[in-house]
């Protein structure tokens, strides 16, 4: 959605290379490859991984210096991310993380809110998705 794109564009201004990585969640209905990547990622490097994010990052570190970028909308997101970071740092103490805050106009947008809008009325969430 537009909030994710905003964070991605900011990360691309900071880092030489950005890989969008999507974890495969076994708790969700869609299997690997069934949930298509958005068109906005067509010319950007993107990968899916199974297992722990820290393990995925370790495989990437075999070939490059890696920094995990996490997007934030508000203080609630920060609280959640800091808690998650504590777990990840126990598994990977050398983890490097950068938090990037989205622009104000995207603070209210979340994937779950868009999914809920779509359940109510197909196409209702489209206004929060990038137009290409």
Model-derived segments and spans:
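Nucleotidyltransferase catalytic core that binds NTPs
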Residues: 2-132
């Amino acid at each position: 959605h537009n909030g994710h794109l905003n964070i991605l564009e900011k990360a691309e201004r900071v880092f030489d290379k950005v890989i969008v990585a999507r974890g495969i969640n076994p708790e969700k209905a869609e299997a690997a490859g069934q949930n298509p990547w958005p068109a906005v990622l067509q010319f950007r490097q993107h990968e899916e991984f199974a297992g722990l994010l820290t393990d995925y990052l370790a495989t990437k570190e075999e070939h490059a210096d890696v920094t995990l970028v996490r997007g934030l909308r508000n203080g609630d997101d920060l609280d959640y991310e800091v808690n998650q970071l504590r777990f990840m740092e126990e598994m990977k103490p050398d983890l490097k993380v950068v938090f990037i805050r989205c622009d104000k106009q995207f603070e209210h947008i979340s994937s779950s809110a868009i999914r809920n809008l779509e359940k109510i009325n197909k196409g209702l969430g489209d206004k929060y998705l990038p137009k290409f």
